[in-house]
């Protein structure tokens, strides 16, 4: 397993676990909001230096939508040695907001797939097990992966084996790189939402927050 040692991810991707078969039918029929265990995975690489305020705002908005039974953790990353678990699983919004507000930009080549794998491993091993609970990871990035040692096929296999869907909010002040994030989302049943300005960020976050809590 890749050791957590890094920064904050700039495309928000949410990994979402399917509910058990018997409960799935109930949830999908009713559209009921279910409790979720999820991780914020945030790119803190230098290419996002001018976007840090927007990234912090996006992550904070995701946290603010948490219900009383939702738990979350925060991972930031740049390259593989800088994948850092900034906040362990917690139900407390205040602890999550502190982790988000303390994010900072670092130099290095971005390793999206390695960060996703690390976060998925942590989620699957540490999420609370108490009946019908969804699992998710929120990835924030521009989608450019320059340094991962993990293969995308292997990462997708882990996500599918753990019934985790991926939702992405992609942002950049120059260019979005869709290849990796599109595949992660589409092959796990998630979506990619692109945020081009601060004005549309709230809508993107609301779309992800709603979908990660329902079937």
Residue ranges and their predicted role:
Residues 2-4, 17-52, 89:
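Acidic, polar low-complexity linker/tail segments
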Residues 4-13:
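Sec-dependent N-terminal signal peptides
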Residues 24-25, 36-37, 45, 56-60, ...:
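Exposed acidic/Ser/Thr-rich ligand/metal-binding surfaces
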Residues 30-31, 64, 129:
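Short secondary-structure boundary/capping segments
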Residues 32-34, 66-68, 160:
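Solvent-exposed loop and beta-edge segments used for protein-protein assembly and interaction
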Residues 54-74:
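An active-site-proximal "capping" alpha-helix that borders the catalytic cofactor pocket
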Residues 198-203:
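A short acidic, often aromatic-flanked loop/helix-cap motif at beta-alpha or helix-coil junctions
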């Amino acid at each position: 397993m890749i050791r957590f040692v890094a920064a904050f991810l700039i495309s928000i991707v949410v990994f979402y676990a399917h509910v058990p078969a018997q409960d799935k039918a109930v949830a999908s029929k009713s559209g009921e909001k279910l409790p979720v265990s999820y991780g914020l995975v945030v790119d803190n690489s230098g290419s996002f230096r001018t976007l840090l305020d927007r990234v912090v705002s996006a992550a904070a908005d995701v946290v603010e939508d948490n219900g009383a039974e939702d738990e979350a953790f925060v991972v930031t990353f740049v390259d593989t040695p800088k994948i850092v678990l900034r906040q362990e699983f917690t139900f407390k919004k205040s602890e999550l907001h502190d982790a988000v507000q303390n994010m900072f930009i670092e130099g290095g080549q971005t390793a999206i797939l390695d960060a996703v794998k690390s976060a998925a491993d942590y989620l699957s091993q540490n999420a609370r097990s108490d009946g019908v609970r969804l699992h998710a990871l929120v990835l924030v990035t521009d989608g450019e992966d320059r340094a991962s040692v993990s293969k995308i096929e292997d990462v997708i296999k882990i996500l599918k084996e753990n019934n985790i869907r991926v939702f992405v909010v992609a942002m950049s002040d120059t260019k979005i790189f869709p290849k990796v994030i599109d595949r992660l989302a589409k092959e796990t049943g998630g979506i990619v939402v692109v945020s081009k300005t601060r004005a549309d960020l709230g809508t993107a976050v609301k779309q992800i927050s709603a979908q990660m809590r329902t079937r």
